[in-house]
């Protein structure tokens, strides 16, 4: 659009709408002092993106006024149903307004007026003077103002909307939008509309009649009696709703020169960015300096970072480590795969003030030792358990070294794992972030020295720059260790660290080193079948819709929307102003499947296509060419509840057969090594057993002590029948409620999930708590505990801070409540599994068994076992895992064995 880039365009930002969207667009973000700033950061980022993209000469920030507006005079209940804003929102607004003042953005607000009306009024005044206006907003109300000189830019969809785009999306002209909302209403603003008329009904009426007046003059032409009756009975509400929705003009007498904006003032916000700790925004301003002009950590603090390039210096360093018996170690690789990428150097620190980098894989180095020289010298030190090692993300470095035949012994601390325990969810735990947070010592990032300098990999770096970066890694790790150790003790989490999280590093290291075998021949057979099935589904769809659509992309929501809603004339389920495509998510397709066979086929096609693209095609690319196995990564720091997460690839998410691909058996491609079988050890209903123990609900505890089927027992009470008379469908409902109660089950969610009336779902939940009353009491106690401390703790002491627990906003409080309850139960269950893995790993070695834990899938372990050790291993597994704690609620482990993963899948 030519007018958008013209100097005759004024950008008007809906500040109030932006503020709320910015608040919810990011996870909570805080300064070191705990001040929430995510709305400020997100708001500024959105402004920056817009300024960079459009380089506006005129820019204005428009705000709603405080208190009542003229619409409240017309309708006192206007916006009455809105939740209280988050408690920290308005403090963040003050920072945003300060930012706008610093960079010279004019801010406009007027008592009794809303931002929408002010923007409309400014735009109309500009229009008279031949100027164009762009409303920067996602507010649907503003569509009514669209004209040749007024356009909307939705920053969240990165999309311009003019009158033509609007009419294409909505199916009627801009001038009819107030008519449309007179019928539909707006729940967010408590504008009533005409009850009983939804989006489709409103659209049909607006397309049939010219205006609200025309509609009421010709009510007899409304075909549906129910709709006609609703219109007759709610005429007053319809006209009121239109009045509330209409934008109104208010004189402002603003001079155009007051709206000018100079992009060069951006640097004025630097002190604010520094105060709020917006490091990326600070670096954006300061980072324009060449790296050589930026102060190095070694210069800033007077540290000495040395490069080791002679055998004499290497021998002297090894001697120092041998004498001190403690060392911080880091590795430098040419990539992120420790079992494949080339090791190019070691980073060493023995005492604060001096650190070393030993390069041996830098391609442009004039002089460096060989890899063999360095590793041969260091191997005796690295495998010596009496020499204490401190690392940051130890598992990665241990894998990098085992790739060269060195198994590290003597690890005593991992700063990454410690930091994850003691920090809040919003805090970053990378070494650079920890150095700046705890030591106030900024370090160069990988991007600073490699990516931004035009290098492709670490081994390309010149030695002096590599030394500054790498030696600082080991140096700061050594400095952080006593600080983080003390913080663990202070927060009562040292026992958790020492008994669970730290020893788990070795277990996960061994699992990742071992890897798992993938039979690509089986995968190719599955691929052949899936490819055939996809082709057949597409052919079937073509038969149903006609050959002219045979080239349609079934993975394109836009093309599918056109097919379903324009060609097949199926009713749109989700479509809002400003979207360029129809919603075709699985919920929509399942609803449409009752009206036409094509949507059901599309659901099946999508599931098969995802199976092929995400698993069948992708998994072989992860096979290590040296080992012939897949080595996934297990993270202890990715999930706030403490659960382990698998990535590269995610092997916790390998699907079992579904209704859409029965018989494909993707898991059958995963096999144990020759002579072994797979043993699955699965904790039965572990989270429910945790719930029973933590709540000490008598009925729940007794059910597990008696070995009853807990789902059948729950269902019997729900349906007022005996346990013997519970049918399968009833048990499924009992199961659904049992497992969902810890995830904040609501009547609405249950009714939607089970496709039952809301009132029935509400009764089921009430009966559940009547059956297990102590569960409700326990949940209340968790909320009280969280409110008292600001955090919830698991049974073993892991903390999770939940600031939303103090919210007056019901939506935010309910979310915080669910998080607190779920963290207590899921986090405790995760710790039981971790403790079980640690104890089992020790027991297998103690019994001289050759079984290896390969995977952890949340409540289940996949173990490779020699066939001649199967019976003994199974006994050890059950004995260890079932007795990991001494509770009055038994832990039960079910075991299965088979020749591939599919055979042991339930």
Model-derived regions: residue spans:
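Noncatalytic, basic helical substrate-engagement surface that gates or grips nucleic-acid strands
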Residues: 2-136, 140-162, 237-253, 258-260, ...
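Conserved RNase H-like, two-metal-ion catalytic cores of nucleic-acid enzymes
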Residues: 4, 10-11, 15, 21-60, ...
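Acidic, glycine-rich two-metal-ion catalytic cores of nucleic acid-processing enzymes
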Residues: 333, 341-343, 348-351, 380, ...
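Catalytic palm active-site di-aspartate
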Residues: 414, 473, 504-513, 519, ...
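A common structural junction motif
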Residues: 771-773, 879-887
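Conserved "right-hand" nucleotidyltransferase catalytic core of DNA-directed polymerases
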Residues: 230, 234-364, 426, 434, ...
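Short alpha-helix plus adjacent loop in nuclease-associated cores
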Residues: 77-91, 95, 145-172, 228-230, ...
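Non-catalytic nucleic-acid-binding/docking modules located in mid-to-C-terminal regions
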Residues: 4-7, 56-60, 97, 105-106, ...
């Amino acid at each position: 659009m030519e007018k958008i880039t013209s100097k005759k365009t004024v950008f008007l930002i809906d500040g109030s709408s932006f503020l709320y969207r910015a608040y919810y667009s990011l996870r909570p973000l805080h300064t070191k002092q705990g001040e929430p700033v995510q709305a400020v950061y997100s708001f500024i980022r959105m402004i920056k993106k817009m300024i960079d993209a459009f380089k506006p000469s005129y820019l204005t920030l428009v705000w709603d006024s405080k208190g009542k507006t003229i619409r409240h005079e017309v309708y006192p209940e206007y916006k009455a149903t809105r939740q209280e804003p988050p408690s920290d929102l308005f403090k963040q607004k003050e920072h945003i307004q300060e930012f706008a003042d610093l960079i010279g953005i004019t801010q406009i607000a007027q008592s009794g007026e809303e931002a929408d009306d002010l923007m409309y009024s400014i735009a109309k005044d500009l229009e008279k003077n031949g100027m164009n206006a762009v409303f920067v907003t996602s507010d649907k109300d503003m569509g009514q103002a669209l004209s040749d000189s007024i356009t909307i830019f939705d920053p969240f969809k990165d999309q311009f909307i003019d009158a033509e785009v609007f009419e294409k999306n909505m199916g009627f002209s801009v001038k009819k939008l107030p008519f449309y909302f007179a019928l539909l209403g707006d729940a967010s603003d408590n504008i009533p509309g005409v009850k009983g008329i939804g989006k489709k009904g409103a659209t049909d009426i607006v397309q049939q009649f010219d205006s609200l007046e025309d509609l009421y003059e010709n009510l007899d032409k409304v075909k549906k009696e129910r709709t006609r009756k609703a219109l007759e009975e709610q005429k007053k509400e319809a006209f009121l709703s239109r009045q509330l929705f209409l934008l109104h003009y208010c004189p402002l007498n603003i001079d155009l020169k007051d709206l000018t904006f100079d992009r060069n003032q951006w640097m004025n916000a630097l002190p604010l960015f520094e105060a709020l700790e917006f490091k990326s925004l600070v670096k954006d301003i300061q980072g324009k300096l060449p790296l050589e002009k930026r102060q190095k950590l070694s210069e800033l603090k007077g540290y000495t970072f040395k490069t080791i390039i002679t055998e004499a210096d290497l021998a002297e360093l090894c001697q120092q480590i041998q004498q001190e018996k403690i060392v911080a170690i880091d590795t430098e690789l040419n990539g992120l795969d420790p079992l494949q990428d080339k090791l190019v150097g070691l980073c060493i620190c023995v005492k604060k003030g001096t650190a070393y980098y030993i390069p041996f894989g830098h391609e442009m180095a004039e002089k460096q030792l060989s890899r063999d020289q360095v590793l041969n010298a260091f191997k005796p030190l690295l495998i010596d358990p009496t020499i204490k090692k401190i690392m940051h993300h130890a598992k990665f470095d241990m894998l990098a070294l085992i790739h060269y035949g060195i198994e590290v012994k003597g690890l005593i601390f991992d700063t990454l794992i410690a930091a994850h325990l003691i920090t809040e969810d919003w805090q970053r735990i990378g070494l650079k972030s920890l150095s700046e947070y705890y030591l106030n010592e900024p370090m160069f990032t990988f991007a600073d020295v490699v990516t931004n300098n035009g290098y492709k990999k670490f081994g390309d770096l010149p030695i002096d720059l590599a030394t500054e970066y790498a030696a600082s890694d080991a140096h700061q790790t050594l400095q952080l260790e006593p600080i983080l150790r003390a913080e663990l003790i202070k927060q009562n989490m040292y026992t958790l660290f020492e008994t669970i999280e730290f020893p788990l590093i070795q277990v996960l290291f061994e699992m990742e080193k071992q890897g798992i075998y993938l039979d690509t021949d089986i995968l190719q057979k599955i691929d052949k079948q899936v490819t055939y099935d996809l082709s057949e589904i597409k052919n079937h769809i073509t038969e149903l819709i006609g050959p002219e659509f045979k080239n349609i992309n079934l993975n394109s929501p836009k093309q599918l929307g056109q097919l379903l809603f324009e060609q097949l004339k199926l009713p749109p389920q989700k479509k809002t102003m400003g979207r360029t495509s129809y919603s075709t998510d699985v919920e929509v397709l399942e609803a449409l499947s009752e009206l036409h066979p094509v949507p059901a086929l599309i659901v099946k096609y999508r599931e098969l296509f995802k199976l092929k693209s995400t698993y069948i095609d992708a998994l072989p690319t992860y096979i290590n060419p040296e080992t012939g196995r897949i080595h996934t990564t297990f993270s202890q720091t990715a999930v706030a509840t403490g659960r382990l997460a698998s990535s590269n690839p995610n092997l916790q998410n390998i699907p079992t057969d579904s209704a859409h691909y029965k018989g494909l058996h993707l898991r059958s491609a995963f096999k144990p090594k020759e002579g072994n079988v797979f043993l699955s050890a699965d904790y039965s209903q572990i989270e429910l057993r945790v719930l029973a123990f933590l709540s000490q609900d008598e009925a729940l505890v007794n059910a597990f002590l008696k070995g009853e089927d807990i789902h059948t027992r729950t269902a019997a009470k729900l349906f007022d029948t005996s346990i013997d008379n519970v049918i399968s469908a009833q048990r499924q409902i009992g199961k659904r409620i049992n497992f969902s109660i810890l995830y904040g089950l609501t009547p609405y969610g249950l009714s939607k999930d089970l496709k039952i009336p809301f009132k029935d779902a509400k009764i089921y939940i009430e009966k559940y708590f009547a059956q297990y009353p102590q569960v409700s009491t326990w949940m209340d106690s968790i909320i009280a505990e969280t409110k008292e401390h600001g955090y919830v703790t698991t049974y073993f002491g892991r903390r999770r801070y939940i600031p939303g627990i103090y919210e007056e906003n019901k939506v935010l409080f309910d979310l915080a409540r669910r998080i607190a309850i779920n963290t207590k139960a899921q986090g405790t269950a995760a710790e039981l599994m971790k403790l079980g893995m640690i104890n089992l790993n020790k027991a297998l070695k103690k019994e001289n068994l050759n079984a290896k834990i390969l995977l952890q899938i949340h409540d289940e372990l996949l173990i490779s076992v020699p066939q001649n050790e199967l019976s003994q291993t199974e006994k050890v597994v059950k004995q260890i895992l079932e007795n990991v704690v001494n509770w009055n609620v038994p832990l039960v482990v079910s075991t299965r064995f088979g020749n591939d993963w599919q055979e042991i899948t339930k």
